[in-house]
Amino acid sequence: MKFFIDTANLDEIKAAAELGLLDGVTTNPSLIAKIVADPANFTYEDFKKHIAAICEIVDGPISAEVTTLEAEEMIREGEDLASIHENVVVKCPVTLEGLKAIRHFSSEGIRTNATLVFSPSQALLAAKAGATYVSPFIGRLDDISTDGMALVEQIVAIYDNYGYHTEVIVASVRHPQHVVEAALAGADIATIPFGVIKQLVRHPLTDAGLTKFMEDASVMKKS
């Protein structure tokens, strides 16, 4: 399973990349807003420069989301985003207009990430439209007492049934168990916040074992 980081924070991206485990990056308008010091003066050109900076750090798919709702506007903005760098993937919502845009991008060889997916039918339509990736948001489903991981399992099964090449990116990951469950479900990718990436390596028995080993090592050095 591939690991993407779900952030627009350059320091977090650099830190994750240094681990040697990072395959790509996903961003969205909310993540961009978190890192903007002066939102009133943050322009679309600033946004493009920020995406370009991410592309310089990670040699892999970098998802950048359109901020319009009509297909023609999505296409215009998406083509502009795709021109930033060959690794840019255009994120489009799975709406009727978004599906039109995804189909257009597919025909032009521009990679897409169908986002805000909450049902198997949305994922099926995204694959039919030619999406490169589809992003089910499991944490947000869990928030409303719905089994988010069951959706991932359904999408994987549907894609396997018909041989769709659309890759499943498990998004809205809240904790390490989501990552493990995504791997067990056969998802292609998990896009993970930096905090959760750091949690993946932690275990209390590992910490206890290290403490004991260091204590014993200290004794050996003194003897």
From Swiss-Prot:
Catalytic reaction(s) noted: D-sedoheptulose 7-phosphate + D-glyceraldehyde 3-phosphate = D-erythrose 4-phosphate + beta-D-fructose 6-phosphate
Disulfide bond residue pairs: none
Enzyme class name: transferase
Gene that this polypeptide is encoded by: tal
Enzyme Commission number: 2.2.1.2
Organism lineage string: Bacteria, Pseudomonadati, Chlorobiota, Chlorobiia, Chlorobiales
Record pathway: Carbohydrate degradation; pentose phosphate pathway; D-glyceraldehyde 3-phosphate and beta-D-fructose 6-phosphate from D-ribose 5-phosphate and D-xylulose 5-phosphate (non-oxidative stage): step 2/3
Residue numbers annotated as active site: 91 (schiff-base intermediate with substrate)
Gene Ontology, cellular component aspect: cytoplasm
Family the UniProt entry places it in: Belongs to the transaldolase family. Type 3B subfamily.
GO annotation terms (biological process): carbohydrate metabolic process; pentose-phosphate shunt
Domain of life of the organism encoding this protein: Bacteria
PROSITE patterns: TRANSALDOLASE_1
Record key words, sorted: Cytoplasm, Pentose shunt, Schiff base, Transferase
Molecular function in Gene Ontology: aldehyde-lyase activity; transaldolase activity
Function: Transaldolase is important for the balance of metabolites in the pentose-phosphate pathway.
SUPFAM superfamilies xrefs: Aldolase
Subcellular location: Cytoplasm
The protein's name: Probable transaldolase
